[in-house]
């Protein structure tokens, strides 16, 4: 953060001193720093959206509008005033202040969901209420109340049960409102349902609902053996100490186990993974039939990983599906992605050839372990049939979803240029790739329920922001927004991109260079 501020200060100073263009403004820190009085005025216009099944909805300040993918026209679904009325607000009051963060939890139902504040029956302590409203019948469908100080919220879209953490203990509240404690001995030394391993290996949460929402896998982390590392919280009026558990290199690290809780029985079983000492458990995934759990297990040296399958009902280890090792490191970052049309196959992401790519695993074709050499002295061992789905000297950056009819997968990659991100689809049966955008700049996408449309958000050095709705079958897009350049009245420096060779004379190192306004190539800066 300090480096970014220094860079911004240098840039603003150069712009202020060297700006020579007639009639143009010079940037100030208020213009460029988040929190500045004019910062938001210099951000490009945006369009806030959410998917309602296969339909794209504009979630605006004052209401929600369905967007027609063929012509971009909008149809009002409901207004903010109407939503507040349905939530029980009076004429001169409001329960929610905007529609930016509403959700559409069921693609087949005219339901909108939001969170409102409330006071529960537990002594008047503040609560939050997840409320679902039918905007066709204009009535509440159901509500779910939970403590306002709850963290790590994880709601199952199938059962509508909610998992949450409070004071390091894990709880589950069912759709009917019954709350049960999964743990009771949580503390700073023993935490449940939270992220573990300091968020390494793609870990972003600590709970994992089964597809049907009837079972909950969760992390339990014993960090009592890890010493407190002193930190200072400078956000308080007077700085306070804020110790955290940090396993220093060569010192003892925390021990993680994985449990599976069933709300209908109130029982927990534990995966029989063995001694957790000096091991990492990550990328927890459920099988589509809710019966198996897959987990990637690494040693502390982080140079050997195993993909292991467990029986969810008993916790018994069933076997190893895949192994990967490398003399430097192995870094699994993603869980399994099962094909919606074939539950015996899943997509696995690996950097085993030096670049992150997609591999198709077929569980219906077990085999004697096949060992292969991989990138720079690494090796992998396949216990089922594995087919590379993508390959090359480029990186798969993000998987967006599936086109269910064409049986394709949509993803972002930097195949065109290392500094770009573009949207592709790849046909699973043969690996045929199709570019779905203009091949320029940086694109981010989100896909509707059946993969027929992708919302494409694009920017480049000459395009502030462009948002389109693209048909994934033919690649044709309908522009929804092209933002005007908010910097057009300012002295903007020239920004160039390029590459230089590393010390080995072979490796390309890519850069972005910001030149002073009125740059003189003959002048030494």
Predicted regions and their residues:
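Bacterial N-terminal signal peptides that target proteins for export
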Residues: 1-10
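Basic side chains
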Residues: 4-5, 220, 425, 512
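Beta-propeller folds
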Residues: 21-447, 452-453, 461-465, 470
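Serine-hydrolase catalytic core recognition
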Residues: 227-228, 290, 296, 442-525
């Amino acid at each position: 953060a300090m480096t970014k501020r220094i860079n911004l200060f240098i840039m603003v100073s150069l712009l202020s001193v060297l700006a020579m263009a007639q009639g143009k403004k010079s940037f100030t820190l208020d213009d460029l720093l988040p929190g500045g009085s004019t910062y938001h005025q210099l951000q490009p216009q945006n369009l806030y959206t959410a998917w309602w099944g296969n339909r794209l909805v504009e979630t605006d300040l004052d209401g929600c509008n369905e967007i027609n993918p063929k012509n971009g026209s909008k149809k009002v679904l409901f207004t903010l005033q109407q939503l507040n009325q349905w939530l029980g607000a009076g004429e001169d009051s409001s329960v929610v202040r905007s529609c930016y963060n509403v959700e559409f939890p069921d693609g087949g139902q005219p339901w909108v969901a939001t969170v409102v504040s409330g006071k529960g029956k537990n002594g008047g302590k503040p609560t939050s209420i997840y409320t679902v409203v039918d905007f066709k019948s204009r009535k509440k469908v159901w509500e779910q109340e939970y403590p306002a100080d709850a963290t790590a919220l994880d709601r199952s879209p199938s059962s509508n049960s909610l998992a949450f953490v409070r004071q390091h203990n894990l709880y589950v509240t069912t759709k009917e409102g019954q709350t049960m404690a999964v743990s009771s001995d949580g503390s700073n030394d023993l935490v449940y349902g939270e992220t573990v391993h300091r968020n390494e290996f793609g870990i972003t949460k600590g709970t994992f609902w089964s597809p049907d929402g009837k079972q909950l896998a969760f992390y339990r982390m014993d960090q009592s053996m890890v010493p407190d590392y002193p930190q200072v919280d400078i956000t308080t009026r007077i700085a306070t100490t804020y110790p955290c558990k940090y396993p220093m290199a060569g010192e003892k690290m925390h021990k993680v186990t994985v449990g599976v809780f069933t709300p209908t029985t109130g029982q927990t079983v534990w995966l029989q993974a063995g001694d957790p000492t000096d091991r990492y458990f990550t990328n927890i995934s459920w099988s589509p039939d809710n019966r198996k759990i897959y987990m990637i297990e690494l040693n502390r040296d982080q140079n050997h990983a195993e993909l292991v399958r467990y029986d969810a009902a008993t916790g018994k280890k069933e076997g190893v599906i895949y192994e990967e090792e490398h003399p430097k490191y192995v870094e699994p970052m993603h869980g399994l992605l099962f094909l919606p049309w074939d539950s015996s196959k899943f997509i696995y992401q690996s950097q085993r050839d030096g670049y992150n790519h997609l591999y198709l695993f077929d569980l219906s074709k077990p085999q004697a372990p096949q060992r292969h050499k991989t990138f720079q002295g690494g090796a992998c061992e396949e216990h089922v049939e594995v087919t590379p789905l993508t390959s090359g000297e480029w990186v798969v950056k993000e998987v967006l979803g599936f086109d269910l009819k064409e049986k394709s997968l949509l993803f972002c990659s930097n195949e065109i240029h290392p500094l770009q991100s573009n949207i592709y689809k790849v046909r699973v049966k043969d690996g045929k790739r199709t570019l779905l955008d203009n091949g320029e700049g940086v694109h981010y996408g989100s896909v509707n329920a059946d993969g027929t449309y992708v919302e494409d958000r694009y920017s480049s050095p000459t395009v502030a922001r462009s948002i389109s709705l693209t048909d994934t079958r033919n690649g044709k897009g309908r522009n929804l927004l092209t933002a005007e350049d908010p910097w057009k009245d300012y002295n903007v420096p020239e920004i160039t991109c390029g590459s230089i060779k590393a010390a080995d004379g072979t490796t390309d190192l890519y850069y972005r260079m910001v030149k002073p306004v009125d740059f003189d190539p003959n002048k030494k800066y």
